[in-house]
């Protein structure tokens, strides 16, 4: 029988499947719905140093092949997470071996550093740094657009954080390979990509943009081939693990990312369509492996690179 166990930064996960931040709450919301023995880890709801109420107006808008969201990082803040939600995630770790990942955003270098330092002293396993947040000091441009700015914030967080550090990239980055190299040089232990793609929707009846901020984040099957291309580029640019995400909805989707060289994958929008998506994807991966005589993921990880 296929063995889906995956080593990510020294943590041996049940499978390469990680619940993507913002789509599974803190994991506990899914405990009665999903078989956590099939799930490798959970990246909790995106955090900021101080709690945020999130965006007003419409927050979700379905497209023919995806979902546009404008949540606005609604969250209770880092300290509240450490005091309350983290304890619930740690129960999942104790019961099922689920790797606990804290996703951290920020609106200034100082916020990133302070939040990372607090998480570093907590019981989380991995800190996932979301650098898609706007930098208020430079007119709101996301940290993840230019390699120099991204490298600088990662370097500062690295100095403050003793935990394994995974950096989540924006697809709006000017140059994915150069961005990955800058982040690796700044001390990142792993890279996850890609975050949502900027998108727009118009409400015909109201004759105005759906979202108050006009632009919002597109995820789902529509973005998968582009995300796969970016993962391919990232794997070729760095020597640290790459976690792939973007439109993964089936076992075959996940296996594409593994064959492109990803160490693990995250599942996001699919969880809204099917609360059991993560375990279903793991089961489909195992079934394909059994059918094709593949015993472990290491046998096929990156295989497409040598056959391309």
At which residue positions do the language-model features occur?
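Hydrophobic faces of well-ordered beta-strands that scaffold small-molecule active sites
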Residues: 4, 17-20, 40-44, 100-104, ...
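Surface-exposed amphipathic alpha-helices with a cationic face
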Residues: 7, 11, 82-95, 120, ...
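Alpha/beta enzyme core
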Residues: 107-243, 252-267
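Extended, intrinsically disordered, low-complexity segments
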Residues: 224, 283-308
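Short gly/pro/ser/thr-enriched loop/turn and capping motifs at secondary-structure boundaries
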Residues: 48-53, 134-136, 198-201, 272-274
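Small/polar glycine-rich anion-binding or flexible loop at a beta-alpha turn
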Residues: 248-252, 274, 306
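C-terminal helical cap(s) of enzyme catalytic domains, especially alpha/beta-barrels
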Residues: 54-64, 202-216, 258, 270-295
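N-terminal capping/small domains of soluble enzymes
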Residues: 1-100, 106
């Amino acid at each position: 029988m296929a063995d889906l166990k995956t080593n990510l930064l020294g943590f041996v996960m049940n499978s390469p499947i990680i619940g993507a931040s913002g789509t599974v709450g803190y994991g506990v919301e899914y405990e009665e719905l999903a078989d956590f023995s099939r799930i490798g880890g959970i990246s909790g709801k995106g955090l900021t140093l101080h709690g945020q109420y999130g965006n007003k107006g419409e927050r979700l808008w379905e497209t023919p092949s995806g979902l546009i969201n404008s949540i606005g990082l609604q969250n209770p803040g880092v300290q509240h997470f450490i005091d309350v939600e983290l304890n619930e995630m740690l129960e999942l770790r104790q019961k099922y071996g689920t790797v606990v990942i804290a996703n951290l955003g920020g609106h200034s270098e100082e916020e990133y550093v302070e939040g990372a330092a607090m998480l570093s002293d907590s019981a989380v396993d991995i800190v996932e740094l979301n650098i898609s947040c706007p930098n208020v000091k430079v007119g709101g441009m996301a940290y993840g657009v230019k390699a120099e700015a991204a490298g600088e914030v990662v370097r500062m967080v690295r100095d403050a954080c003793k935990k394994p550090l995974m950096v989540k990239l924006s697809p709006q980055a000017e140059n994915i390979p150069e961005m990955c190299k800058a982040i690796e040089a700044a001390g990142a232990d792993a890279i996850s990509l890609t975050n949502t793609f900027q998108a727009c929707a118009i409400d015909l009846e109201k004759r105005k943009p759906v979202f108050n901020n006009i632009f919002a984040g597109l995820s789902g099957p529509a973005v998968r081939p582009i995300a796969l291309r970016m993962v391919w580029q990232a794997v070729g640019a760095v020597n640290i693990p790459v976690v792939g995400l973007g439109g993964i909805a089936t076992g075959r989707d996940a296996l594409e990312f593994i064959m492109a060289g990803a160490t693990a994958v995250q599942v996001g929008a699919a969880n809204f369509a099917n609360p059991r998506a993560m375990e279903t994807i793991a089961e489909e991966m195992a079934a394909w492996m059994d059918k094709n005589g593949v015993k472990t993921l290491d046998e096929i990880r990156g295989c497409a690179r040598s056959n391309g």
